[in-house]
From Swiss-Prot:
Keywords: Membrane, Transmembrane, Transmembrane helix. This is PsbF-like protein. It is a multi-pass membrane protein. GO terms for cellular component: photosystem II reaction center. Belongs to the PsbE/PsbF family. InterPro entries: PSII_cyt_b559_bsu, PSII_cyt_b559_N. Pfam families: Cytochrom_B559. One of its GO terms (biological process) is photosynthetic electron transport chain.
């Protein structure tokens, strides 16, 4: 029963850790002085093909797209992998 619960919770945990890791790597989460700082805008040096009309404070890093990719994309891959694995279990390649 513990294994089944872990299999269900694993995609959520991986998505959460992945989101925290990448936002820390990009400099959005600042882990200084034991306080969680949040700086959503980064001024990328090579961020645009056309350098004119860039925002003054940089571009937002954490957007709805970031949330969708990290929080929805990773569990979707696990879900599709589970459906793929079920095809083999159903045909008797693996004994369930």
């Amino acid at each position: 029963m513990v294994l089944k619960t872990l299999i269900v919770i694993a995609p959520i945990l991986i998505a959460a850790f992945s989101t925290i890791f990448w936002l820390s790597y990009w400099g959005v989460f600042k882990w200084e002085d034991n306080q969680l700082g949040f700086e959503n805008y980064q001024d990328w040096e090579d961020s645009g093909v056309i350098p004119e009309n860039r925002p003054k404070g940089g571009y937002p890093v954490f957007t709805v797209r970031t949330l969708a990719v990290n929080a929805l994309g990773i569990p979707t891959v696990f879900f599709l992998g589970a459906i793929f694995a079920m095809q083999f279990v159903r045909r008797g390649i693996f004994i369930a």
